[in-house]
Amino acid sequence: MDCNASNNFREPWPENVVLYQPYETEQILLAENASCLAVKAYLKMCNLSFHIRSCANAEFMSPGGHMTKLPVLQAGSFIFSEFTPIINFVKHKGEELGTWMKEDEKLEMRTYVSLTENTLTMAELYISFMVKRVYDEFTAPRNGCMHPWPLNKIQNFIKLRQAKKLLTVYQWKDMEINDVLTKVCRCCEILQAKLQESSGLFFYGEKPCELDAIVFGHLFSMLSLNLPDTALQSIVQQFKLLMKLCHFIDEEYFQKKSESSLKISCTSIPLTSAPIEKMRLNLANTVHEEAMRAYNKQKQQQQQQQQ
């Protein structure tokens, strides 16, 4: 990192921070919603100002990521995506939660954060893409809703292939649904046991930390999105302490501080950032390239079968 970038990191929190995400009502998927909720909860817990901007191509604005690629945070000249990189940026700004925690507590907390993110994100992706009813009735319609035919079909094909690849990397793709639900249940048991040890409302006492934010993001997403299959929701509802935590965070940080003043439409703020604009313009090219690769692969398979 050069000297100018280092100095920018040390500057105060910018006033024009924008959080990009897909449309909540029509488009956002389960795992994406969980990640976006977790980031919003963390920023609100830090009492940091930001604007929420919903747009159809939020995923294509992302500079990268190892799971959902969302949300995308633009803070001045910096662009970050997903929960951990965004939280690390907040820490560099000196605005993070948990400064009061001991070092061993921070290390322990990061272990719980990793467990939560890896287990619940994979479970959300599995339910969304590997359970046929959920995919047909929820995932595919929402993922393709912002694209005209046949781009919606192409986009669904690309998204399904990406999800299966990620599930394969984490060795979740070939699991049975009962194995997935067992892992979710075990994760919730571990989290509830940790919450029971706390003397306060949150995992580490009377003040929130990033574990509270990420647990809220995933569990509240499972509870609030209307999936055709309610297996995940039923599991979460068994853990009363976790349910209580989610409802408290929702009321304290989302209901009391209405998001209406923070939400902005896609046309209310121009895209002045060159990197964001460039990524937006690349959307059509990306979809076209993926479509051509899929077409050529299918054509080659047909030729091989004929031979």
Q: What residue ranges belong to the model's regions?
A:
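GST-like fold's C-terminal all-alpha helical module
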Residues: M122-H247, Q307
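Short amphipathic alpha-helical interaction elements and helix-loop-helix interfaces
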Residues: Y23-T25, M45, S49, I79, ...
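A diffuse structural propensity rather than consistent per-protein peaks
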Residues: S81-E82, C209, T272
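Acidic carboxylate-rich catalytic motifs and surrounding loops in phosphoryl-/glycosyl-chemistry enzymes
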Residues: I52-E59, E206, E259-I269
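Pan-eukaryotic secretory-pathway lumenal catalytic ectodomains of glycan-active enzymes
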Residues: Q237-Q307
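GST-like domain detector, emphasizing the conserved glutathione-binding G-site
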Residues: M1-F157, F203, I276-Q300, Q307
